[in-house]
Amino acid sequence: MTTSPEASVEARDLTRKFGDFTAVDSVSFAVRPGEIFGFLGPNGAGKTTTIRMLTSLLPPTSGAATVAGHDVATAGDRVRRSIGYMSQLFSLYLDLKVIENLELFAGLYDLPPERVRERTAWALETAGLDDRRETLTGTLPLGLKQRLALGCAALHQPAVLFLDEPTSGVDPRARRRFWDLIDRLAEGGTTVLVSTHYMEEAEYCHRLALMNRGRLIALDRPAALREGFPGTILDVRVEGDPARAVAALENVEAASDVGMYGRALHVRVEAPDAGRRAVVDRLTREGLGVVSAEPVPASLEDVFVALVRQEGGAAEG
């Protein structure tokens, strides 16, 4: 496979089948050096399978991909030496101290002694763990384990860093701190590919690949995806049960997508004025007092829901 000279990662028609089931279906994209590139989609969309192929842990059924200039199918060893990888399980040894985990990974990466001191000091400082270097890893809060795992994955200064749903189960404040670290790595030139199902995290990516049922259904900057949203979103608030309001709008022709958004409803309409009248009329007839029904900018969640509907529904699992 000939790689574009400006691409750190490139996939062309990348496909993976398990028997008759197609987990990843002809996915193509290219990622630039220093870019934070996100995979967004529900469980079962193909995000993890794509990352496993790109890290040469799983051979493609067809198609091709290169990472840091190396073919994932024919140069797996070189690919693995060029990357860092962090999964949602973190892969830390809980019975080791923080510094011992870092030194262990430094040994796995075959770093020379002088580099071990330099890079472990960097990881401790970057993760905010200087004062916990002698702490048993298993006693750390989840957010600190997460930052330690990122430090281990980036210890050898890989050209490309793969993060597979790394913030699952972590509170929003810890997630924001984690993304600050990702930004620092990207600013230093590391290419970062990250999968997530958190919409707010997806906003931090430079570009997003939206995946559903193994297919790439959209690829662009988060702002561009929102700006290209088809139609208008109404933010609807009712006095009664929002779930009842969702059910009441199911057969309203003017309301093509209806979903809960906190205590509000987000309703997609093609014509804002006519759509608003149709929504308010139906809710009023159903005895649900309408507090407000106003147009708002589309969120990434709105974009994703609309695209999935066009593709015939979400992946299962």
Segments (PLM) and residue ranges:
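Conserved ABC ATPase "signature" region
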Residues: 103, 107, 114-132
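Conserved catalytic motifs of ABC-family nucleotide-binding domains
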Residues: 157
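Conserved ABC transporter NBD signature motif
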Residues: 63-71, 79
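Catalytic Walker B motif of ABC-type/P-loop ATPase nucleotide-binding domains
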Residues: 161-164
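Hydrophobic anchor residue at the start of the ABC signature
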Residues: 150
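ABC transporter nucleotide-binding domain
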Residues: 180-194, 199-270, 297
